Amino acid sequence: MAATCQVTGAVPGFGHNISHSHRRTKRRFDPNVQKKTYYVPSLRRNVKLTLSAKGIKVIDARGIESVVKDILARGVKI
């Protein structure tokens, strides 16, 4: 899925638009997903990740090495 965070696993949510007359139409709530490139010294290369805003904060807090290690342990190809 394109709108999925590789760190947090955030995926789109679904709900309704509700008009003034309370008619409901289906809609999708997408996470704030960005493509971001990081240099990973242990791999000696750049890694391009699809991240939500929260995922970027997780990398800032824990470090890219720790996060990439967890992603690879889950078997996700990066």
Curated annotation (Swiss-Prot):
InterPro entries linked to this entry: Ribosomal_bL28 (IPR026569), Ribosomal_bL28/bL31-like_sf (IPR034704), Ribosomal_bL28_bact-type (IPR001383), Ribosomal_bL28_sf (IPR037147)
Any one GO CC term of the record: ribonucleoprotein complex
GO biological process: translation
Example of a GO MF term: structural constituent of ribosome
Keywords from the named record: Ribonucleoprotein, Ribosomal protein
Pfam families per the UniProt record, alphabetical: Ribosomal_L28
Matching PANTHER family: 39S RIBOSOMAL PROTEIN L28, MITOCHONDRIAL (PTHR13528), LARGE RIBOSOMAL SUBUNIT PROTEIN BL28M (PTHR13528:SF2)
NCBIfam families the record matches: L28
Protein family membership: Belongs to the bacterial ribosomal protein bL28 family.
Protein name: Large ribosomal subunit protein bL28
Organism in which the protein naturally occurs: Clavibacter michiganensis subsp. michiganensis (strain NCPPB 382)
